[in-house]
Amino acid sequence: MRTYENKDELKKEINKSFAKYIFEFNDIPESLKDKRVDEVDRTPAENLAYQVGWTTLVLKWEADERKGLHVKTPSDDFKWNQLGELYQWFTDTYAYLSLQELKDMLNDNINSIYAMIDSLSEEELFKPHMRKWSGEATKTAVWEVYKFIHVNTVAPFGTFRTKIRKWKKKHYNSEVVLLNKMEILI
């Protein structure tokens, strides 16, 4: 997993990967937000809903700990062996929104994650056992807070950018094939 020298380096990497990811949605019309294509597991709305869901959880973990609440990861209603159900919950909770609403929510979450990073000391961000929620999140490993931020921002922004690019390619290629077939019939 990628490591970072300091907060600024982490924020720059989030910014870079987020900008590339979110840009891919600029040319997808709202009418296609729920369109399925072969070989791609998520629609554009589901793709964004996944990102909104995970970034919302990261922010909730930190907010709840600051309030003195016990944090259950990944969420109060799901265990780590129920990620499929959690992903479906993300879809059910967020994917009905417009692409613009989803992009706005994700942008707000990323800005809140920047503020969260700024509010933590370098030690709290990069050393283990500095947050209960990060230390107790998994049974097999203790992760520093920055790792949870990385795997819920930088890493999926890259992976899901590839998925949405594939979605666009498959969708627009199928449109070209359909138009070519129509021309042949005419």
What are these regions (language model features)?
Residues 1-20:
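Extreme N-terminal tail/first-helix region
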Residues 82-126:
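Acidic/histidine-rich alpha-helical segments that form the ligand environment
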Residues 2-5, 86-100, 139-147:
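Acidic/His metal-coordination segments adjacent to aromatic residues that form catalytic metal sites
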Residues 18-29, 55-59, 63, 107-121, ...:
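Structural signal for well-ordered, non-membrane alpha-helices
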Residues 34-85, 128-186:
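Short, contiguous alpha-helical
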Residues 1, 12, 35-38, 93, ...:
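Short N-terminal micro-motifs specific to bacterial/archaeal maturation
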Residues 4, 10-11, 80, 102-103, ...:
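Short leucine-rich amphipathic alpha-helices used at interfaces
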